[in-house]
Amino acid sequence: MKKFLKYLAVFLVVLLIAAIAFLFRPIASKKIQTSANEPVVDVVLVGGGIMSATLGTYLTELEPNWQIRMYERLDRVAQESSNGFNNAGTGHSGFMEMNYTEEKDGKMDISKAVKVAEQFEISKQFWAYQVKHNVLGQPSSFINPVPHHAFVWGDNVAFLEKRYAAMIKNPLFYGMQFTENANQIKQWAPLTMEGRDPAQKVAATRMEIGSDVNYGAITTQLVNNLDKHQNFKLSTSSEVTGISQNDDKTWTVAFKNLKTGKADHVKTRFVFIGAGGASVKLLQMTGLPESKQYAGFPVGGVFLMTDNPKIAAEHTAKLYGRAELGAPPMSVPHIDTRYIDGKKYVLFGPFATYSNKFLKQGSQFDLLASTNKNNVLPMTAVGMENLDLVKYLVSQVMMTDEDRFNELKKYYPNAKREDWRLNQGGQRVQVIKKEEGKPAKLQFGTEVFVSKDRSVTALMGASPGASTSPYIMLNLLEKAFPQQVKGEWNPKLHEIVRSYKQDLSDNPVLLDQVRQYTSQTLGLHYTPLTQADFAKIAASQSK
């Protein structure tokens, strides 16, 4: 026994030493050797998703002479979270997402819903501009009109009614309908009501202007257009292996062709890391002091999906429920119409899964590889402070197929098992951020990183993500290129986004003009406001 304890003690000491050595290992890239006469490009975009595609499109229009390079580790762009089958395709506008509104001291706070709705109006303007200029193709190839509904039952009916009463006063949500009438809800979303107990108390809201968006199609079309420009070059099957700063403050990005094994590098003045869940690891390569405050927590997701034509024909709606008390925002259940590559699907979920991967096609060592002496304690602290999230993830991972199907039946009572299959969605990596003097926080939104010298930027985090990518990248431009945005770029930005720097929630006339323009261009459902409508809005705002 003594011998065993001795060996155990030695083993634990060795394990502790190995753990300390691992945590204190260098995480920044070694300096990449370059020659002084190498050409320097203007921009390197790491990752071939919707963020890089959107930023590349902005920059090509603002600075057509800039040399831009894009590197994607897979053999095609838009194959991770941007891919149509890897997300729910929601054009997040705050219309139905009840986790964007919360009741505080008896008052309904709709500020987050207003913010998200404003941002999506920017997205629609950006896409409409690209359609007008033949950058994006037929609108129905990437966006389709699908009304947005919030749906509740039982005790949550009172919450939804209060939410509606608060939201209808804001011009962004004018036209929202509310009902507790089961027959009316059946007209809006037949599958949701067929087979439901008629005694059950239910309520729903509806916004006609809602949409379903294929972000993979947008990404592919934007990149295809970029590829037509002589100053742009896309390299697929190319994994970034290092990012280091040069003495002249430019950057060298090293990459390896995964098909040939050939290693190469490029020098650049500006780096954008838009690699989805992998952005945290890639940002750590830079060695920037301000990058040390970040860590990532990966969460996967699966959906139940059907392409049964009869079911798809009966459901043209995105319908969101309300998350259970104490559950994280990612747990909101919804049953959605999806249009992907010309075919109609119905999706239900998401159900959380756990994986150490930071990308769907990543490595099980991703989480471990991103852990170091700078973030191990913040990660531990966040885990201890978010036991509700841990409990939720455990309960989700333990779910059986029968459990998932029973959740579906709450939203589609007549559902049949044989019509549905599981579809693995993309990986989302929630950001853990530790600022000096403050406790570490788990963030559920998106995080824009800009280095102090503004030469390195990154996009991390999750929802609303892709749906507000034009707004997010516009925000990034403002932080990374403040002089140009205020100066020579300003007229072009106003041309691309007509409401740029204007508050639509306080300007119903401009909002109506913008929605008429984007809805006509993108083929969305919108009824222009009348003088009587403007009078109602003014009266509701004065109350």
Curated annotation (Swiss-Prot):
One of its GO terms (biological process) is tricarboxylic acid cycle. Keywords: FAD, Flavoprotein, Oxidoreductase, Tricarboxylic acid cycle. GO terms for molecular function: 2-hydroxyglutarate dehydrogenase activity; L-malate dehydrogenase (quinone) activity. Pfam families: Mqo. Its cofactor is FAD. InterPro entries: FAD/NAD-bd_sf, MQO. The keyword Oxidoreductase applies. Pathway: Carbohydrate metabolism; tricarboxylic acid cycle; oxaloacetate from (S)-malate (quinone route): step 1/1. Its EC number is 1.1.5.4. The keyword Transmembrane does not apply. It catalyses: (S)-malate + a quinone = a quinol + oxaloacetate. Belongs to the MQO family. NCBIfam families: mal_quin_oxido (TIGR01320), PRK05257.1-1 (NF003603), PRK05257.1-4 (NF003605), PRK05257.2-1 (NF003606), PRK05257.3-2 (NF003611), PRK13339.1 (NF009875). This is Probable malate:quinone oxidoreductase.
